[in-house]
Each structure stands twice: as C-alpha cells, then as structure tokens.
Amino acid sequence: MKKSPGLSDYLWAWTLFLSTLTGRSYGQPSLQDELKDNTTVFTRILDRLLDGYDNRLRPGLGERVTEVKTDIFVTSFGPVSDHDMEYTIDVFFRQSWKDERLKFKGPMTVLRLNNLMASKIWTPDTFFHNGKKSVAHNMTMPNKLLRITEDGTLLYTMRLTVRAECPMHLEDFPMDAHACPLKFGSYAYTRAEVVYEWTREPARSVVVAEDGSRLNQYDLLGQTVDSGIVQSSTGEYVVMTTHFHLKRKIGYFVIQTYLPCIMTVILSQVSFWLNRESVPARTVFGVTTVLTMTTLSISARNSLPKVAYATAMDWFIAVCYAFVFSALIEFATVNYFTKRGYAWDGKSVVPEKPKKVKDPLIKKNNTYAPTATSYTPNLARGDPGLATIAKSATIEPKEVKPETKPPEPKKTFNSVSKIDRLSRIAFPLLFGIFNLVYWATYLNREPQLKAPTPHQ
C-alpha cells in the first residue's frame, strides 16, 4: 500500500532546496570551513618548520657547501657621475638556496610569504663589494618576497637601490667607453662554506628593463657576468661580478666645446686677410681668440675629475690653442718687418721729399719779376754815358704767369706680406689635416666590451 507524503517529507525537501541555494549539502564542508582548515594547515606547517629551527646556522653545516644561486633584474640604471666616478642602479635582487630543515608536506607545494618570515630563517649575508651606499626599500612595507617549496628550496627577492663605484679611464674622453662593475658576495662565509652561482646562463642572469635606462650622456650597450675568487686575510671568498658597458654620447660636447674651438681657430685666421698696417684690428683678433680659447679650456674641465693625464678633448683644445696663439705670433712677425724702412718688395715705405730749387724770381702780388738793380747816375761828372746806363738798367717788372706745382711723388704702399700669403694656405691646411686625423682615430675605435675580473 502506497504511503502518502507527510509533513516530514515536505520539510526534508525544503531543507535540501535551501542547502543547495546556500552552497551547502549534507556530507560537504562550507567554503568558510575550507578556508579555516587551509589557514590552520598553513599555521601548523609554519609552526612545524620553525620548531627547533636555528637561523644562526647555515644549511648543510658540517655536511656540504651551501650553494646560493642569484640573478638580477635591473629596473632603473643611472645616472652616472663622471666627477665622482659612480653610478646608481635600482634592482630586484634574487637569491635561491636549499635548506633541508624547511621541507614540508601538505596540500600546497609552495608557501608564499613576506618579509616577516624572512627574519626568522637563515638568509645569505650578501653585500656589494664596490657599493658606496645600498638602500633596501621599505615603503609601505619592506619590499621583500619569500617563497618556500616543499623540497626546502627558497627564493628570496628584495628591491635595492645601490650606488656603486665605477672606475673610469678618461684618456679617450669624450669618445670613451666604460665597464661599470657590480660586485657582490658573502661577507662572512668563505668559499669552503658558501659559494655563489648564476641561476641561468650568463646572457639571462642579469636583465635590464627596456625602459630602465636613465642616462643622458651614455648609451647602455649591454652587460656581461663573471665570477671569481678574492683572497683576503680571512680566507678566499667567491665574488660575482656584472659589468654594465657604457658608451658616451658625443653630441653635447660637440655643441659645447668642439664647434666653438673650431670657429675660434677659423676666426683667428681671418686676420691673415687684413692689411698688415691694420694693427688695431689684427691685435683685437689675436688677443680675443686667445682669451676665448682659454675660457673654453677652463669650462671643459669643470665636469671632469682632476685626473693627472690629458684627455682627448684636452689634446684637441691644446692644438686649437696653439693655432690661435701662432696666428698672433704670425701677426707680430709681419708687423715687425712692416715698421722697417723698406717693404718686402724693396720699395721705400717713406715717400721721398721733393728737392727745393732756388728761384731767382721774386714773388710779388702773385707775379714774378727778376731782381732790378738801380744805378744812380753821377751827373756831377757830366758823363753823358752814365745817364744812358741808368736808364737802360731800370726794367719795369713784367707780369709772369704762376708756375704750376710740381707733381706729388707717387706714394708707395706695403705689398701683401709673403708670410701672410703663406699663412693663408698653411694654417687652414694644417688645421684640416689635424681634424681629419683626430676624428678618424677616435671615432673608429671599438669600445672595450669586456673588463677583466681578477681571479686568484
């Protein structure tokens, strides 16, 4: 006999429907229960890992050498200071090693933790050998990451800003290239206890972000990695080295130094085309260009450290200074010979004065008349001939036309100096040859892409 459904059956159906809507069913835990269970599992795993753990002891103490694998991701490179010979770099510094004491078994394969756990376990005492100042970012919390896998392998990542030394050889400045190193290793553990290795192959162990360059005067050509051993009084230590290869941009220095020097030399050679009697003009050309070169040489050195050797720019400025100073000396030489009595063509510089000719005529009222001699007749003696002589000796002055002035002597000017003629050709030719050799030598040099790392 079939039994009709009762009140209990209706209640069972409604209970099953409501449990379906709320995500619950008989025999299955709720989501909150699952999260609570996972949190409990995490807590128990961490408590078990740290139970009896001594973070003062390195992994494998007394059994094996601890291997620390590293790689670097550069988020920002620069700026570079030539004066202080240093550079600034912002990196994500990653280290990985294995600690058997941190093995675990659980529903998860990786424990993702933050800096709080990192302070409770052993971590490598890595420091930067050539670092002047290193800063670990702490805003808003310490920028540190820790991952622990079930086999005890740890990944420890931190964000650092490092200001490191970059030894520079400025002989080729400003066509120079540099390899700025970043050296790091263990501070306390020798290579018998802790060794460092690159995580990946050399080409991928250090990576620079595409937009990571913060350089105005340099091009970042690339980077290379290396490793070596450094001997000290406390033992031998493994040192990992990364070289960042830089090539200086020359555009700024062409505009600020090279072009002004070239234009100053050309301006100094304009004086060769001026008349050698133009002493003030040629003196102004010479003195002004010499002072200009002096100012340029001083300003070019302001951005560089006080090195004891001459740079490529120093040689260029020195040669330009020599050309400008030689132009001034050339004018002094020409002027010295110009002051003498004869020019280079043998003609007299001082015009000859016309000789004075005595004129027997007397000028009177713009007329010329010969000198008249009067004889007084002696009538007392009664000599009739004397009266005749007196009469004939007196000659009335005749009007004479004014005599034309003698032609002025032809003025003799100094011809163009032979020294000036020679300088007009020699100076530009020599300066052009110098520029050709200078730029061909320095621009065709290949940058040194590999800096040596000492191995011992």
From Swiss-Prot:
Recorded topology in the membrane: Multi-pass membrane protein
Stretches of the chain found on the membrane's Cytoplasmic side: 275-279, 334-421
Reported tissue expression: Cerebellar granule cells, Purkinje cells and stellate/basket cells.
Activity regulation field: Allosterically activated by benzodiazepines, the neuroanesthetic alphaxalone and pentobarbital. Inhibited by the antagonist bicuculline. Potentiated by histamine.
KW Cytoplasm (keyword) present: no
Chief location category: membrane
Keyword hit for Transmembrane: yes
GO biological process, one term: inhibitory synapse assembly
Keywords: Cell membrane, Chloride, Chloride channel, Cytoplasmic vesicle, Disulfide bond, Glycoprotein, Ion channel, Ion transport, Ligand-gated ion channel, Membrane, Postsynaptic cell membrane, Receptor, Signal, Synapse, Transmembrane, Transmembrane helix, Transport
Extracellular-side positions: 28-253, 302-311, 442-456
Gene Ontology cellular-component terms listed: chloride channel complex; cytoplasmic vesicle membrane; dendrite membrane; GABA-A receptor complex; postsynapse; postsynaptic specialization membrane
CDD domains referenced in this protein's UniProt entry, alphabetically: LGIC_ECD_GABAAR_A1 (cd19034), LGIC_TM_GABAAR_alpha (cd19052)
Gene Ontology MF term list: GABA-A receptor activity; GABA-gated chloride ion channel activity
Residues at which 4-aminobutanoate binds: 94, 157
Cell compartment(s), UniProt: Postsynaptic cell membrane; Cell membrane; Cytoplasmic vesicle membrane
Range of residues in the leader sequence: 1-27
Cystine pairs: 166-180
Glycosylation sites: 38, 138
Record's catalysed reaction(s): chloride(in) = chloride(out)
PROSITE patterns linked to this entry: NEUROTR_ION_CHANNEL
Function comment: Alpha subunit of the heteropentameric ligand-gated chloride channel gated by gamma-aminobutyric acid (GABA), a major inhibitory neurotransmitter in the brain. GABA-gated chloride channels, also named GABA(A) receptors (GABAAR), consist of five subunits arranged around a central pore and contain GABA active binding site(s) located at the alpha and beta subunit interface(s). When activated by GABA, GABAARs selectively allow the flow of chloride anions across the cell membrane down their electrochemical gradient. Alpha-1/GABRA1-containing GABAARs are largely synaptic.
Record remark on domains: The extracellular domain contributes to synaptic contact formation.
NCBIfam families to which the protein is assigned, alphabetical: LIC (TIGR00860)
Subunit text: Heteropentamer, formed by a combination of alpha (GABRA1-6), beta (GABRB1-3), gamma (GABRG1-3), delta (GABRD), epsilon (GABRE), rho (GABRR1-3), pi (GABRP) and theta (GABRQ) subunits, each subunit exhibiting distinct physiological and pharmacological properties. Interacts with UBQLN1. Interacts with TRAK1. Interacts with KIF21B. Identified in a complex of 720 kDa composed of LHFPL4, NLGN2, GABRA1, GABRB2, GABRG2 and GABRB3. Interacts with LHFPL4. Interacts with NLGN2.
Name this protein carries in UniProt: Gamma-aminobutyric acid receptor subunit alpha-1
Species this protein is from: Bos taurus (Bovine)
